[in-house]
Amino acid sequence: AIVGYHTYPHIDLFETGCKAARLMLRILSGDVAPSMAFRKIPMIVPAENMQTTSGPFGRLMDVAEAFERTSHSEAVSIFGVQPWLDIPEMGCSVVVVTNGNGAAAEAQASGLANAFWKSRHEFDVDLVPAERAIREALREEGGPVVLSESSDSTGSGSPGDSTGVLRPLLEAQLHEPAAIFLVDPVAVQVAHKAGVGSTVLMKIGGRFDRLNSRPVPVKARVRLLADGRWTPMGRGYNTGIETCMGRSAVLEVGQVRILTAERSAMTVDPELFRSHGIEPAHMKIVVVKSPNGFRALYEPLAKKIILVDTPGVSSANLASLPYRRVPRPIYPLDAGVRYSAPVQSEANRRSMRSRA
């Protein structure tokens, strides 16, 4: 049996683990004879609009939970897929597990898959160029305004070294503070060698993804040096577990605080900045390198959230990604894709024929 999360951002890790464990024990005791139905949908959707608190994915998950409550389904899972993967198995999917009722599993899986497919256009996102996003943020009364640089999402496989937002942020010559995270081991080494309070001249960022980003020359003051150890405190991702991103440093260029680290780190928890003396609630602009996972902890803080359009290997602009291995045709990469979920899966048809 497969049991998936019901929240994105994933704040139900513990609950899902308990649910899976209980189901496993019931299977082992003979109380449940799992019957499972699977539907693969020829579709990729951007992660930026897959939150379950609202929107199309939230509505689909409401249906899944209703099935679990009212139709005796053991587990109903909807998988929105990691859109940046270039694999032959690519595509959104639905899995339904029932207690021996194969027909119900098949019907629910097909119904959810068709509903998922029909809502595909609702997952489209409006991305804002970085320069315009910064101007919009500065026009807002108060803050913080959170800029999501999802194309460089450290939780999506990107290196975290993009200067796509950093460069225009520095060029804007802000009068109010801003914070951004950047992976740059060379900059950290320079900062640690210079010491706190020193002024350093260097090029920062663009160390790894040189196709999509270029280093930015800066004159920065070393505000803080640390060992890069910090503990996420918010519900969801590695709560209470100390993580280490190598040595770290906070560089100050005008009003911009650049938290640099030798290794990557998830940016979904404000504690990343707080552990380095930066309070996100006091910033005018906070840049997170995450498509959606940040919402659980940043939405209560944010005056506004803007999805920024910058080049990168985890871009929401799916047409810009160099897919080579995904099955074709697939939405939205190809025009005229059609889909209707089968009433019964091929595997179950073969199983029924073998029993006949």
Residue ranges and their predicted role:
Residues 185-231, 306-313:
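Acidic, Ser/Thr-rich peripheral helices and adjacent loops at domain boundaries
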Residues 32-36, 45-132, 139:
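Accessory alpha-helical/coil subdomains and C-terminal extensions
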Residues 7, 22-33, 62-73, 99, ...:
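Generic secondary-structure signature for well-ordered alpha-helical cores
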Residues 1-33, 144, 149-166, 170, ...:
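Active-site histidine-anchored catalytic micro-motif
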Residues 99-102, 151-154, 184-187, 256, ...:
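Short, glycine-/Ser/Thr-/acidic-enriched flexible segments
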Residues 49-56, 136-138, 154-166, 191-196:
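Short glycine/threonine-rich loop-to-helix capping motif typified by GTGT followed
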Residues 139, 144-145, 152-155, 238-239, ...:
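Non-transmembrane, aqueous-exposed alpha-helical and coiled segments at domain scale
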